[in-house]
Structure formats: structure tokens, C-alpha cells
Swiss-Prot record:
Cytoplasmic side: 1-11, 207-210, 279-288
Record Gene3D superfamilies: 1.20.140.150
GO aspect biological process, one term: fungal-type cell wall organization
InterPro entries found in the cross-reference section: SUR7/Rim9-like_fungi (IPR009571), SUR7_domain (IPR052413)
Protein family: Belongs to the SUR7 family.
Cellular-component GO terms for this entry: cell cortex of cell tip; cell division site; cell tip; Golgi apparatus; Golgi membrane; plasma membrane; plasma membrane raft
UniProt keyword annotation of Cell cycle present: no
Protein name: SUR7 family protein pun1
Amino acid sequence: MGMGFNPIKALFTGIGTVCVGVGALLSILCIINQTQHNIAFQNIYFIQLNTTSIFSVANQTAVVNNTSNLLNELTGTLVDTLETYIDQGATDLIEQVEQEMKDVSELPDWYSIGLWNYCQGNSSDYTNPTYCSTPSPSYYFNPLTMLETSINNATGSQINITLPSEVDLGLKVLKGACYAMRAMYILGFIFFALTIVSIVISCLPFFGPLFLNVFSFFATIFTFIAAVIAVATYRIAISELEKNIEILNIPIVLGKKIYAYSFLSAAAGLAACILYFIGNLTSGYSPL
């Protein structure tokens, strides 16, 4: 078809460019996440820790049940009445102690973990944080550091939590994974941007199609790797934390938006690769 205008190629290239734009936009949302707090960046976090029950007594039910079982071995109206008062009294006392400990500690009700920082807030609003740490390129998810900081700020004291060697090693691995994930997200966005820039030379017979396909391919790969690292890292982190700090009763959940954005961004990049490739084939040559 020579160097003339090819409407079919233009159509595929145009749709592919829209996919690249979508991928780049979603990539930006993943990278910025908790560093901004307007409506576009709400609830974009990797995991959220719920600390509303951190002071609950883990064996509350066991204590009450053991008391009930002991009293059930006896008979009589007086014993039945006494059992009722003990059950209710134990529950009320525990709830009162939990609330007083919560009020004194001034710990937040939740923490959300982002790419550059963490945020915390109250149970009355799980969307808008009351505080976010300063975004930093050296930040990585360390739950014990977060708790230490919150407790020290609330009490004005200096508390240091000592970890077993295997847990400390796990945090170092987690640190490396967080850094790698951050690098993959940034590289993915850079290649999305390079893909958009290379559109201006896409009319060139060889280098134009080559750059479009190569840049969109690497944008897809890096974004997908970032998403996989994020899912694997934080699923393992949740499993280990729930196993090792079960006594603290801190439920942890994965975020939804950031993983959806990550995989959709990679899918958009993949769609762009395919569309660019098909468009180039209609010109009678392949960039590969």
C-alpha cells in the first residue's frame, strides 16, 4: 500500500492509542494512590488493617463459657440466677475495659497501606483518613513501625518492639518486594508515556511500528509484573501477620481498586499491542 494513508491501520492504531491512554491513566492512579486525597484517589490501597478490636480479650468467650459449664454442673434456681449475672457481668466488664483502653491509647481504628506511605483514620469514616505519613521513596510496609509510631505519639513514650530473627528476615524480604513493585509500576508508566510519544513517528515504515509495539509491550509487562508482585506480597504478608499477631485481633483485607486498576492497565496495554500489530500487518509489513 506504499506510504499513502491507510484507513484500516489508522483505525487500529487509534483504538490502540485509546487503550494506551487508559492504561497510562490507571497506571497513574496506582502510582499516586494515597499521596492525594481527592475523590479520584479514595480507597486506593494495597491492604487495610482494622484495629478497632486490638484491645479485645481473646479468651473472653472461653472465660464466660467455662464459667457457664461449671455452673451447669450444679442445680437450683439460685445457681441459674447467679450464672446469668456472672455471664452478663463478665461481658459488660470486658467491654468497658476494652473501651477505656481504646480511649486512653488514642490508636486509630484503621491503617491503609499505599505505595509511598500509609494512612490512618476512624471507624466512623473508612474513606477519608485523619492522618497520612509523608510520602517517601524509601517507604515500605512495616506494621510494627506503624504501631510503634502511633503508640509513641499517643503516650509520649518511646516503645520499641523486638522481633524474632525469622520475622525480621521476613520484613527485609517484604521491603525488597515493595521496592521492586514500586519500580515496576514506574517503569510501566514510563513505557506507556513512551508509547504515546512514539505515535508521532508511527508513520515511519519501520521504526514507527517497532517503537509502538516494543514500548506498549514493555508497558504491559512491567505493569503486570507489578500487579503480580503486589498480590503475592500482600497475600503472604496477610497470612503471616494473621498467624503471628492473632492475639492482637487485627483483621486485614486486600484493597480492591488498586489491584483492579493494575490488571486493567496491563490488559489495556496488551490490547494496544495486539491492535498495533494487526494495524501494522494491514500495511504489508510487521515490526517483528
